[in-house]
C-alpha cells in the first residue's frame, strides 16, 4: 500500500529548512527516500531537526543535545525503530 509522507527538516546553521512529500510502499523505500531527501534538501552533514507526517501520525526528532553536523547515518540506529513504528501506523 502506497503512503504519502510529508517531511520537514532544518539544518544546524539555522539558515534554512527543507520540506517535501514522498510516496512510498515499503519501509525500506521510506528509509531510502528519507536519506535522499536529507542529502538533497537538508545538507546531510547538518541536520538539526526533522519531522515526518502522515494522516494523524507524526514523528519528530531533534539533535539539539548532540554535537553539530551529525548526519543522519550517525543517529539512524537510534531513530530507525521509531520511524518503522511511524511508517507502519501510517495509512
Task: List PLM regions with ranges.
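Short intrinsically disordered terminal tails
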Residues: 1-4, 84-91
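Short aromatic-glycine-(Arg/Gly/Cys) micro-motifs in beta-strand/loop hairpins
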Residues: 2-16
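Acidic, low-complexity, intrinsically disordered interaction modules
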Residues: 12-80
Amino acid at each position: 500500500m502506497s503512503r504519502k509522507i510529508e517531511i520537514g527538516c532544518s539544518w544546524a546553521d539555522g539558515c534554512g529548512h527543507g520540506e517535501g512529500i514522498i510516496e512510498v510502499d515499503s519501509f525500506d523505500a521510506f528509509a531510502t527516500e528519507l536519506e535522499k531527501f536529507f542529502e538533497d534538501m537538508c545538507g546531510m552533514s547538518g541536520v538539526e531537526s526533522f519531522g515526518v507526517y502522515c494522516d494523524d501520525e507524526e514523528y519528530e526528532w531533534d539533535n539539539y543535545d548532540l554535537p553539530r553536523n551529525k548526519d543522519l547515518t550517525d543517529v539512524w540506529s537510534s531513530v530507525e525503530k521509531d520511524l518503522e513504528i511511524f511508517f507502519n501506523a501510517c495509512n
